[in-house]
């Protein structure tokens, strides 16, 4: 409660005088009174209607069920009328408390007059002649202070009591018979247990995301004030939201019961399977039947899933089958490659035809070997030009060029008709490739070299007693003109002169002794220094 004594009376008087007044409270009380009268009028009308039903032509159990279905709603109307009337009375009480507080509160004029009188008395208090009037004035101001504080405290207590005692109107019950409610949902289990903080968090998130259009009450199990079971149209998006919340709460309840009482947990889940899930499946089927497009999409997804399942089943059946044995090819002796011998013919006309005609006799054995498999392809006509004779077979396909045989032939060679011919051709190609990849190795018996550090008289030495011929002249035999065939020789290029004897220079008599190994004896090897007996 507010400590009203701490404030001067001017504050309380100003608050009451400057407020909106009792007009708004009395207006609210009038609205509540009219609402109470409306509820009472509807209740009276319903009572008359139910009485007419019971006394009219409608007789039997259905009429009684109709009256019984409206009984809760009729009771709610009468209770709502009483609640509204009581709320109106509470508003009138608050308005009366405000009016009383304003009447009991010292006015600002009275307070101002007290302050003015106090100032005059103090100003004219010569020799203390106004002491008693000043004391009386101050006592009157203290009375107004206490009166203002007590008035505000009383007004606060009456207003708070009226607001706290105002009854709350409950939601209207549905007008349904007990049998109809059971037919709508044939189970009496509870979707979820006690609400958890996570449930309230999810409810707040739904409210924020939907902009206040989805209000989930975890304690009551309602969505927008309507129970979950009243949402039966699966074509509406809110139905799926409600079902998602319902299934999550069902799973939460099952897990909680599983740790407390497993028997009740499985009994709860069994009730869901028997009563809850079939009801929702029927609702989905009804929604799909009303929308052919959704039905086509649902059937398409089901058919595609069935096709995938049957496909995997077929693959599993194939996994159990034994693969058929593949017959092995009979080994065929590879025909030895024959090299066509080409005659040296300097002819210039039709070199391709000449080579083909010369190679025909030599390739006859190979053709006879595989004659049973396939006939030999006709020779490809060659282009006009110089024909270079070869002593070996010309380069085949894959030798050095990436071109295929069809690039120079007018038509393709016929394919072999049997596996034996293909095997023979593959063997020939493998042997040819092996020969091309073979490398020449040096013989092992050519690794010794001759030692020249021995005394041996050369065979080209002069006879005993004669001087050696020291002059070396250029040979008059040449190697001829070198270069590529078909090129012209330039006459300005001088021919090689060979080895010549250098003439003596101005500083010596002639060429000096060349640099020789230290193991050679120059005196012994000089001309004329050796004795005839030593040469023997």
Swiss-Prot record:
Residues 501-536 are annotated as: Disordered. GO terms for biological process: response to host immune response. It comes from the Bacteria. Residues 521-536 have a biased composition (Basic and acidic residues). Pfam families: PPE, PPE-PPW. Gene3D superfamilies: PPE superfamily. Belongs to the mycobacterial PPE family. PANTHER family: GLUTAMINE-RICH PROTEIN 2 (PTHR46766:SF1). This is Uncharacterized PPE family protein PPE3.
């Amino acid at each position: 409660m507010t400590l009203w004594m701490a404030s001067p009376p001017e504050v309380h008087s100003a608050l009451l005088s400057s407020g909106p007044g009792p007009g708004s409270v009395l207006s609210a009380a009038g609205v509540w009174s009219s609402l109470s009268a409306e509820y009472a009028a509807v209740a009276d009308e319903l009572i008359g209607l139910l009485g007419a039903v019971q006394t009219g032509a409608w007789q039997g159990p259905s009429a009684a069920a109709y009256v019984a279905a409206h009984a809760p709603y009729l009771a709610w109307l009468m209770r709502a009328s009483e609640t509204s009337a009581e709320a109106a009375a509470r508003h009138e009480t608050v308005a009366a408390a405000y009016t009383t507080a304003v009447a009991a509160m010292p006015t600002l004029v009275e307070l101002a007059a007290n302050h003015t009188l106090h100032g005059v008395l103090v100003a004219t208090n010569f020799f203390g002649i106004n002491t008693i009037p000043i004391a009386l004035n101050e006592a009157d101001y203290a009375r107004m202070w206490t009166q203002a504080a007590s008035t505000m405290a009383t007004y606060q207590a009456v207003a708070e009591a009226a607001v706290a005692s105002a009854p709350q109107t409950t939601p209207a019950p549905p007008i349904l018979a007990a049998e109809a409610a059971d037919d709508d949902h044939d189970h009496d289990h509870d979707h979820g247990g006690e609400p958890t903080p996570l449930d309230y968090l999810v409810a707040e998130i739904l409210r924020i995301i939907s902009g206040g259009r989805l209000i989930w009450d975890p304690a009551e199990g309602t969505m927008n004030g309507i129970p979950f079971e009243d949402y039966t149209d699966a074509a509406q998006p809110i139905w799926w939201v409600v079902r998602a919340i319902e299934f999550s709460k069902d799973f939460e309840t099952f897990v909680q019961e599983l740790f407390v009482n497993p028997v009740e947990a499985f009994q709860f889940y069994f009730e869901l399977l028997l009563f809850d899930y079939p009801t929702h499946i029927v609702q989905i089927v009804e929604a799909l039947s009303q929308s052919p497009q959704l039905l086509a999409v649902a059937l398409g997804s089901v058919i595609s899933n069935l096709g995938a399942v049957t496909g995997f089943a077929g693959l599993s059946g194939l996994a159990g089958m034994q693969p058929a044995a593949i017959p092995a090819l009979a080994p065929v002796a590879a025909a030895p490659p024959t090299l066509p011998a080409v005659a040296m013919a300097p002819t210039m006309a039709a070199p391709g035809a000449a080579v083909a005609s010369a190679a025909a006799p030599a390739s006859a054995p190979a053709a006879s070997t595989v004659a049973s498999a396939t006939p030999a392809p006709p020779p490809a006509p060659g282009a006009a030009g110089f024909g270079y004779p070869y002593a070996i077979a010309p380069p085949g396909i894959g030798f050095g060029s990436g071109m295929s045989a069809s690039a120079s032939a007018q038509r393709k060679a016929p394919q072999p008709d049997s596996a034996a011919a293909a095997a023979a051709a593959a063997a020939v190609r493998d042997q040819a490739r092996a020969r091309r990849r073979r490398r020449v190795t040096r013989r092992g018996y050519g690794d010794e070299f001759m030692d020249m550090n021995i005394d041996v008289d050369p065979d080209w030495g002069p006879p005993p007693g004669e001087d050696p011929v020291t002059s070396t002249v250029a040979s008059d035999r040449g190697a001829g003109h070198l270069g590529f065939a078909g090129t012209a020789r330039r006459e300005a290029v001088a021919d090689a002169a060979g080895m010549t004897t250098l003439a003596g220079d101005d500083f010596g008599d002639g060429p000096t002794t060349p640099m020789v190994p230290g193991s050679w004896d120059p005196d012994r090897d000089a001309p004329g220094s050796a004795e005839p007996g030593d040469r023997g």
